[in-house]
């Protein structure tokens, strides 16, 4: 009996849902789930989650007191909201959820560590152990240093917005749990830069993840690779066998609807026998490689700016909703 592409993929790769939409997660039943400020913002705007948003806002206001300015309440509410969505998601999935620190802290090691501690503490207050949470941090040099410290404390990290080999190797050498190289965003950059289209194994994003995966397996790093940011199912098919792949509900449904043979493309045993040169990445090497890699430089900067903007938009949305709730007569809810 033939199987769907998704069913075959699950046999060789841990399938993760890339969404904050709890109903979508219930439908696709992944092992793990990843969220980010853009996904939380999208979910927070859905009528189905209005109660979670409202309860989180009122709780943040209660914590800070009635006289606290709405923007300060909104800031705390976002942290609480990310954890509230994470808690609901963890009630559905057997694995872990990734919750992102504020992207505006991407170049501040100490502030990133402090917020990671706050997120883990919030989960623990909800009865959720740190082993079920991955702290998502942008793959800047400062972010990688924060993750290195957090891992030593037993707080597991997912290093995101990863576009270059220098970022990947620095993460592996720091002993982080997981990295998320962004397949689709790499493709976007090359399409715009060259005016060409890329399909299948020729996709630069696919090539980047393949190179990183083979490097990690060749040299026995414990850091696992989770391909992210897919534009089409073709990219996913080319990365079958990767440790994990985080996929949007739409593409998960497409994979589930199609039946065809799915061969393993990435193989840890084969990677061990490959001729690959080892590199060491200190800060000077990282900065040099980053400056020379236009794509990684551009996409990391753009990604941090994009997540920061999404966060600011959500905080404005939350502040506006807080004012509406404050104006409602007592007992109206």
From Swiss-Prot:
List localization entries. Cytoplasm
Q: Which UniProt keywords apply?
A: Cytoplasm, Pentose shunt, Schiff base, Transferase
Q: Which PROSITE patterns match?
A: TRANSALDOLASE_1, TRANSALDOLASE_2
* GO CC terms of this entry: cytoplasm
Q: Does the keyword Cytoplasm apply?
A: yes
Q: What is its EC number?
A: 2.2.1.2
> What does the record give as the active site?
136
Query: From which domain of life does this come?
Result: Bacteria
Record GO biological process:
carbohydrate metabolic process; pentose-phosphate shunt
- Pathway the protein takes part in: Carbohydrate degradation; pentose phosphate pathway; D-glyceraldehyde 3-phosphate and beta-D-fructose 6-phosphate from D-ribose 5-phosphate and D-xylulose 5-phosphate (non-oxidative stage): step 2/3
| MF terms in GO | transaldolase activity
Which catalytic reaction applies to this protein?
D-sedoheptulose 7-phosphate + D-glyceraldehyde 3-phosphate = D-erythrose 4-phosphate + beta-D-fructose 6-phosphate
CDD domains the record matches: Transaldolase_TalAB
Instruction: State the family it belongs to.
Output: Belongs to the transaldolase family. Type 1 subfamily.
Q: How does it assemble?
A: Homodimer.
Q: What is the designated name of this protein?
A: Transaldolase
């Amino acid at each position: 009996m033939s199987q769907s592409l998704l069913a075959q993929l699950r046999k060789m790769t841990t399938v993760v849902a890339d969404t904050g939409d709890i109903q979508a997660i219930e439908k696709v039943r992944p092992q793990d789930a990843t969220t980010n400020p853009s996904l939380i913002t999208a979910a927070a705007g859905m009528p189905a989650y209005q109660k979670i948003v409202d309860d989180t806002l009122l709780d943040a206001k209660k914590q800070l007191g009635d006289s606290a300015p709405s923007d300060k309440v909104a800031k705390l509410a976002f942290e609480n909201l990310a954890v509230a969505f994470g808690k609901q998601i963890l009630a559905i999935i057997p694995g872990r959820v990734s919750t992102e620190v504020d992207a505006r802290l991407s170049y501040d090691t100490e502030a990133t560590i402090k917020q990671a501690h706050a997120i883990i503490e919030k989960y623990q207050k909800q009865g959720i152990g740190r082993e079920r949470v991955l702290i998502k941090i942008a793959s800047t040099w400062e972010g990688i240093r924060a993750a290195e410290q957090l891992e030593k404390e037993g707080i597991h990290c997912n290093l995101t917005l990863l576009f270059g080999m220098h970022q990947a190797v620095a993460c592996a050498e720091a002993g982080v749990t997981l990295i998320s190289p962004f397949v689709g965003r790499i493709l976007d950059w090359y399409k715009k830069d060259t005016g060409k289209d890329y399909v299948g194994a020729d996709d630069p994003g696919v090539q980047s993840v393949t190179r990183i995966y083979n490097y990690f397996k060749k040299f026995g790093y414990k850091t696992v690779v989770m391909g992210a940011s897919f534009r089409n199912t073709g990219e996913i098919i080319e990365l079958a066998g990767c440790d994990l792949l985080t996929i949007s509900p739409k593409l998960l449904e497409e994979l589930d609807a199609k039946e065809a043979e799915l061969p393993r493309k990435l193989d840890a045993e084969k990677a061990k026998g490959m001729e690959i040169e080892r590199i060491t990445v200190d800060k000077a090497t990282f900065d040099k490689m980053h400056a020379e890699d236009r794509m990684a430089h551009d996409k990391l900067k753009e990604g941090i700016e994009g997540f920061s903007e999404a966060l600011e938009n959500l905080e404005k949305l939350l502040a506006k909703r807080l004012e509406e709730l404050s104006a409602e007569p007592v007992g109206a809810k």
